[in-house]
UniProtKB/Swiss-Prot annotation:
Residue numbers bearing the Phosphoserine modification: S49
Post-translational modification, as annotated: Phosphorylation dependent on the nitrogen source and spectral light quality.
Subunit structure and binding partners: Homotrimer.
Lineage summary: Bacteria, Bacillati, Cyanobacteriota, Cyanophyceae, Synechococcales
Name of the protein described by the UniProt record: Nitrogen regulatory protein P-II
Length: 112
């Protein structure tokens, strides 16, 4: 099993969710996060003053899938979340040793 974590622009969430659900993904976790990458924040104006926002609002999507689904999930994330501009985000893939569904006690593949 693998955990796919994607950092995306907030306004892309609906598009990403639809793409993943249509591809058969039945669960995901979404968290509000803040960070910066190459774009290093942005300059904004408020009441005539200019200030720099160093950490930008993003969303983190976490999905645990069988190894055979990873490439498909990554393809769906990239196609749905891409704008072509700096700040589109990143995808991280890491191994998952085990999963337990708390309600039933099911483990691993049956739990996802």
């Amino acid at each position: 099993m693998k955990k796919v974590e994607a950092i995306i622009r907030p306004f892309k969430l609906d598009e990403v969710k639809i793409a993943l659900v249509n591809a058969g993904i039945v669960g995901m976790t979404v968290s509000e996060v803040r960070g910066f990458g190459r774009q290093k924040g942005q300059t904004e104006r408020y009441r005539g003053s200019e200030y720099t926002v160093e950490f930008l609002q993003k969303l983190k999507i976490e999905i645990v899938v069988d190894e055979g689904q990873v490439d498909m999930v990554v393809d769906k994330l990239v196609s749905a979340a891409r704008t072509g501009e700096i700040g589109d985000g990143k995808i991280f893939i890491s191994p998952v040793d085990s999963v337990v569904r708390i309600r039933t006690g099911e483990k691993d593949t049956e739990a996802i």
